[in-house]
Amino acid sequence: METYTASIRVLAASYYSPEQVAAWAPVPPDAARWQERLARLHTIVTESDGMLAGFASYTHDGYLDFLFTHPAFARRGVASRLYQRVESALRTVGTPRVTAHVSLAARAFFDRHGFQLDAEDCVECRGAYLRRFAMRKDLPNVRLVRLRGLTNR
């Protein structure tokens, strides 16, 4: 939770007002809400010297819910490596597309990684409205194969 909060409060602060940042990353965070949300997701973490450098959480149907880097590790390729691991995991299970709701702060990252814009909207978060982007990336090398009538011949 600390990496998430620090990332928003430091790295996204220039994209959002103080009120929006406070609503998006409240202090203290709601631990029960975090546990409930993460329980439904697959999470990949990366550490450096015992510190959480970043994490990514996703569903096997291709929704990338979280991709955050601790500010101490920003601009060092942590998010790119995490994203590559997510994409690899999704390809392995045959997921044809990655989707995400992306913040203003993360939009350029997702553009660089080949995502396409589907829609733009504002979402309400604890009384504040945050601009975000629905984005997707097709994984063209994934083939959906239906296995029928296989025998041991």
Task: Give short role names for the model-derived ranges.
Residues 2-74, 83-85, 89, 104-105, ...:
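Acetyl-CoA-dependent GNAT
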